[in-house]
């Protein structure tokens, strides 16, 4: 059908009906009805440019009729149908067959152009809309990674919690400690003062002494009176329990003496073991060798025990001095100081001049520490 309508302007000149051709000639809007110069006209009239044709502006009623016919599927109406459409449009204004024909041609080109624009727009919008569902797997992957990271961090937290568990009289004491594993020396005074009294916590990290922050008052710590309620065992040591009467007596004694609150931070296999004897009040400190993922703490394989012989340090409460070890203030006995019992076998204590403190075979310093002096552990 499109090929038959290719040469429409020539078909209008064929004059199939004399009345129709006469009507087209009389129409001022047809291209053939332009002002022609007659052969008998003068030369000045021939030189005159033809007047411009007025453009056909269809009325709203005519546009509605044409749109209804075009939307019904008649994109290229045949010649007979064009005449019928023109007769229908003439009820609302003057119109020619060529006007109807060209309106359908323009309407078809406009629809094609509109479809082309929609197709291009959809083609450009597809790459933008397709990546939008992609963040979902990334979100799922991020959620899975976050869940996996949370899973990976949960065991660490549980490890820290397990590390800070202390079995005291058959119950577990949970402490709030820094995440770094540290070896802390507690204050130890029962009856007569024995060993050393640490006014602040002392920690080893990678062989260096660093100061641990004191826990807040709300920290779940162990008072010395609670430590003396029973022995905190390491490994398979049997726990010993005291009677309620002895416990109350211990608490009354410890409440009379001003003491600081102590928190114990332990590693996987490191725990302090205290054995309370009613006779000599010895304090036994079991320090097995440990290896942590964050730090490596090397201690002696042998049991660091306060000797119960003449080498045992028994210092009265009024015979104590204060020294600075690794910039930390400590209160120690004024007599010979046992370095091995306090810090382990492999630790060497040096003074501010860099000279090591000479000790005997039991780890006791040959010369007492000087009051107010500074010492360092290596």
Curated annotation (Swiss-Prot):
Main subcellular location of this protein, as a coarse class: nucleus
Bias-annotated ranges (Low complexity): 32-42, 137-152, 161-171
Location of the protein in the cell: Nucleus; Cytoplasm
InterPro entries (alphabetical): HD, Homeodomain-like_sf, WOX8/9-like
Keyword Signal listed: no
GO molecular function: DNA-binding transcription factor activity; transcription cis-regulatory region binding
Tissues where this protein is expressed: Expressed in the basal cell and later at the boundary between suspensor and proembryo. Expressed at low levels in proliferating tissues post embryonically. Detected in vegetative shoot apical meristem, leaf primordia, floral meristems, emerging floral organs, epidermal layer of the placenta and in the upper portion of the root meristematic zone.
Record's compositionally biased regions (Basic and acidic residues): 45-54
Swiss-Prot/TrEMBL GO biological process terms: embryo development ending in seed dormancy; positive regulation of cell population proliferation; regulation of meristem growth
Induction notes from the record: Up-regulated in the zygote after fertilization by the transcription factor WRKY2.
Residues of the DNA-binding region: 51-115
Domain of life of the organism encoding this protein: Eukaryota
Annotated keywords: Cytoplasm, Developmental protein, DNA-binding, Homeobox, Nucleus, Transcription, Transcription regulation
Sequence segments annotated as region (Disordered): 1-60, 123-173
SUPFAM superfamilies referenced in this protein's UniProt entry, alphabetically: Homeodomain-like
Entry's Gene Ontology cellular component terms: cytoplasm; nucleus
Disruption of the gene: reported phenotype: Embryonic lethality when homozygous. Reduction in embryonic growth, failure in axillary shoot apical meristem and leaf-primordia initiation and growth, and failure in primary root growth and lateral root initiation when heterozygous. Wox8 and wox9 double mutants are embryo lethal, with embryos disrupted as early as the first cell division in the embryo proper.
Note: The seedling growth arrest phenotype of the stip mutants likely resulted from a G2 cell cycle arrest of the meristematic tissue. Exogenous sucrose in the growth medium reactivate the stip meristems by repressing TSS and activating the expression of cell cycle regulators, and thus promoting G2 to M transition in meristematic tissues.
Annotated PANTHER family: WUSCHEL-RELATED HOMEOBOX 9 (PTHR47288:SF1)
Protein task: Homeodomain transcription factor required for meristem growth and early development. Promotes cell proliferation and prevents premature differentiation in meristematic tissues during postembryonic development. Essential for maintaining tissue growth during embryogenesis. May act by repressing TSS to promote meristematic proliferation. Involved in the transcriptional activation of a subset of cytokinin response factors. May act as a negative regulator of cytokinin signaling in the dark.
Similarity annotation: Belongs to the WUS homeobox family.
Protein name: WUSCHEL-related homeobox 9
Organism of provenance: Arabidopsis thaliana
Lineage: Eukaryota, Viridiplantae, Streptophyta, Embryophyta, Tracheophyta
Gene name, Swiss-Prot/TrEMBL: WOX9
């Amino acid at each position: 059908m499109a090929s038959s309508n290719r040469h429409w302007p020539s078909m209008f000149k064929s004059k199939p009906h004399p009345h129709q051709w006469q009507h087209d000639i009389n129409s001022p809007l047809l291209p053939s009805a332009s002002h022609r110069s007659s052969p008998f006209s003068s030369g000045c009239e021939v030189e005159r440019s033809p007047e411009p044709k007025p453009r056909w502006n269809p009325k709203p009623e005519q546009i509605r009729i044409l749109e209804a016919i075009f939307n019904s599927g008649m994109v290229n109406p045949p010649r007979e149908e064009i005449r019928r459409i023109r007769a229908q449009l003439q009820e609302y204004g003057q119109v020619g067959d060529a006007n109807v024909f060209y309106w359908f041609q323009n309407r078809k080109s406009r629809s094609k152009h509109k479809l082309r624009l929609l197709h291009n727009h959809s083609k450009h919008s597809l790459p933008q809309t397709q990546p939008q569902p992609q963040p979902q797997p990334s979100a799922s992957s991020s959620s899975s990674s976050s869940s996996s990271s949370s899973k990976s961090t949960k065991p660490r937290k549980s490890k820290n919690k397990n590390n800070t568990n202390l079995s005291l009289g058959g119950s577990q004491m949970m402490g709030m400690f820094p995440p770094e594993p540290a070896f802390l020396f507690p204050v130890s005074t029962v009856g007569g003062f024995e060993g050393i009294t640490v006014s602040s916590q002392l920690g080893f990290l990678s062989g260096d002494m660093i100061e641990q922050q004191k826990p807040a008052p709300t920290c779940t710590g162990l008072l010395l009176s609670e430590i003396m309620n029973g022995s905190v065992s390491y490994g398979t040591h049997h726990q010993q329990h005291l009677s309620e009467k002895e416990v109350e007596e211990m608490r009354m004694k410890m409440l009379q003496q001003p003491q600081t609150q102590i928190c114990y931070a332990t590693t996987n296999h490191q725990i302090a073991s205290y054995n309370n004897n009613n006779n000599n009040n010895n304090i036994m400190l079991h320090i097995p060798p440990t290896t942590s993922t964050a730090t490596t703490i090397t201690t002696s394989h042998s049991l660091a025990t306060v000797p119960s012989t003449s080498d045992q340090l028994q210092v009265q409460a009024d015979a104590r001095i204060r020294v600075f070890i690794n910039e930390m203030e400590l209160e120690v006995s004024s007599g010979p100081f046992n370095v091995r019992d306090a810090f382990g076998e492999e630790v060497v204590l040096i003074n501010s001049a860099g000279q090591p403190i000479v000790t005997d075979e039991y780890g006791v310093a040959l010369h007492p520490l000087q009051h107010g002096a500074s010492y360092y552990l290596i």
